[in-house]
Each structure stands twice: as C-alpha cells, then as structure tokens.
From Swiss-Prot:
Record's function text: Variant histone H2A which can replace H2A in some nucleosomes. Nucleosomes wrap and compact DNA into chromatin, limiting DNA accessibility to the cellular machineries which require DNA as a template. Histones thereby play a central role in transcription regulation, DNA repair, DNA replication and chromosomal stability. DNA accessibility is regulated via a complex set of post-translational modifications of histones, also called histone code, and nucleosome remodeling.
Chain intervals for the UniProt region annotation (Disordered): 1-29
Family that this chain belongs to: Belongs to the histone H2A family.
Residue spans of biased composition, Gly residues class: 1-12
Cell location: Nucleus; Chromosome
PTM sites of type N6-acetyllysine: K5, K12
Keywords, in A-Z order: Acetylation, Chromosome, DNA-binding, Nucleosome core, Nucleus
InterPro entries: Histone-fold (IPR009072), Histone_H2A (IPR002119), Histone_H2A/H2B/H3 (IPR007125), Histone_H2A_C (IPR032454)
Binding partners and assembly: The nucleosome is a histone octamer containing two molecules each of H2A, H2B, H3 and H4 assembled in one H3-H4 heterotetramer and two H2A-H2B heterodimers. The octamer wraps approximately 147 bp of DNA. H2A or its variant H2A.Z forms a heterodimer with H2B. H2A.Z associates with the VPS72/SWC2 subunit of the SWR1 chromatin remodeling complex. Also interacts with RBP1/DNA-directed RNA polymerase II largest subunit.
Main localization (coarse): nucleus
Stated name of the protein: Histone H2A.Z
Lineage, highest ranks first: Eukaryota, Fungi, Dikarya, Ascomycota, Pezizomycotina
Source species, domain of life: Eukaryota
C-alpha cells in the first residue's frame, strides 16, 4: 500500500476505524469542563512557556468545575427563595457573600450584584433608644 497507513507498513491499524474511539482527557477523568483548553491556557499564561503536566491540567479543571457547581447551586437556591427561575448577578452576589469560604475566595465586585441587606448594629441601637424615649 504505497502512501497509505496499513498494518503491513506499521501504521495505527485498519484505516476504516475498527479500533476503539478516542476518549478525551475530560471524559477519562469524568469531567464536563475541557482539560485540553485549560492545559492550553496554563501553557500560554506561564512565563517562559513552561511545560505543564497532563495531570496538573486535569486537577485544575476539576477544581474549576467543583467551584462552578458550588456557586451555581447556591445561586440557584437564592433564585428559588425569591421565586424566580432565572439566575441573575444579584443571585450570584447573594450566594457568594452568603457563604463565608466563597466570600474570602472571591473578592471581586460582581456587576449589577447590588449589596447585602445589612444595617449596622450601632444604628439599630439608636433607633431602639428613640423608641423607648417616645414610649416613656
């Protein structure tokens, strides 16, 4: 077989595809996020184009997927509490700021997220003292 990759020449087997289908790194690891893309970003964003191991990319991908699932679950709960079906930046803000660990991890400002409803304790004490004076 000139020009083709057959078994007699030492290619990868039958060209008609009788072998197993290729599995991506994400599928092997049981992940939804793309390990190959994360590996490419890791390689491109390091100084001096350093080498990145395949397991490092899988690990980072798994962490990103877990954090995304955690934030989406909390934001979905916030949307459900407000009886709406669409997650908005406000729900993301409430979810992230409501969880202590996520709040310390994500210190970014979320656009159109608003602020948490909170009244300073000192201001509450002044209002209570005024009520007591008017009652007496």
């Amino acid at each position: 077989m000139p020009g083709g990759k057959g078994k007699s020449i030492g290619g990868k087997g039958d060209p008609k595809g009788s072998g197993k289908a290729q599995k991506s790194h994400s599928a092997k690891a049981g992940l939804q996020f793309p390990c190959g893309r994360v590996k490419r970003f890791l390689k491109n964003n390091t100084q001096n184009k350093m080498r990145v191991g395949a397991k490092a990319a899988v690990y980072v991908t798994a962490v990103l997927e877990y954090l995304t699932a955690e934030v989406l679950e909390l934001a979905g709960n916030a949307a459900k509490d407000l009886k709406v079906k669409r997650i908005t930046p406000r729900h993301l803000q409430l979810a992230i700021r409501g969880d202590e660990e996520l709040d310390t991890l994500i210190r970014a400002t979320i656009a159109f997220g608003g602020v948490l409803p909170r009244i300073n304790r000192a201001l509450l004490l002044k209002v209570e003292q005024k009520k007591k004076k008017t009652e007496a």
